[in-house]
């Protein structure tokens, strides 16, 4: 524990908590502070100028990160007939209907993303209490309920991330790994922020993207000076 404490203390000493860092410096700091023995994820937290308690200001969606997430994704698809074949051809690991539903009910969930064709929702709808709490329930708002299951599978494999604002009005998402080049992290962050801007509720007033901070799994948070994002 002493070694961990010393490492954390050393990392905290490198970052001024109240300072807003230029994007390039912020990403370099985060990578430098990601000193665990595994390839830490690089995460972003975005404080939005919304009232998360209002139903018309819930921000939710998905975006395919141009540099991917650095994570291998296993995809399960509810589809039948031709769409099932298309899902398999696109790379889905598991494709089924009632058989897949029974597998899930039995607790066998060896997948990271669930995609469903609209005509399968009579089966998928019975799994809400199982998939919902795990963030796996297919939803048209994030592109996981769609007639084009093949494209949805390819997007999931290519590095699509889903986002949803929490009760505090903050979006949390992963934009890569410590092993990523800064340019890759920067392009992924830009793609996420662009998706968030497009998802801005019409009823949201004032500054929308209020604060942005990046961190690693075991590292400290670094605030970003938004004026440098377009640099």
Curated annotation (Swiss-Prot):
Family annotation (SUPFAM superfamilies): Ribosomal protein L1
Gene Ontology MF terms in the entry: rRNA binding; structural constituent of ribosome; tRNA binding
Entries under CDD domains matching the protein: Ribosomal_L1
Family: Belongs to the universal ribosomal protein uL1 family.
GO CC field: cytosolic large ribosomal subunit
Stored InterPro entries: Ribosom_uL1_bac-type, Ribosomal_uL1, Ribosomal_uL1-like, Ribosomal_uL1/biogenesis, Ribosomal_uL1_3-a/b-sand, Ribosomal_uL1_CS
Pfam families with a match to the protein in the record: Ribosomal_L1
GO biological process: regulation of translation; translation
Source organism, top-level taxon: Bacteria
The entry's keywords: Repressor, Ribonucleoprotein, Ribosomal protein, RNA-binding, rRNA-binding, Translation regulation, tRNA-binding
Gene: rplA
Free-text function comment from the UniProt entry: Binds directly to 23S rRNA. The L1 stalk is quite mobile in the ribosome, and is involved in E site tRNA release. Protein L1 is also a translational repressor protein, it controls the translation of the L11 operon by binding to its mRNA.
Protein name: Large ribosomal subunit protein uL1
Oligomeric form and interacting partners: Part of the 50S ribosomal subunit.
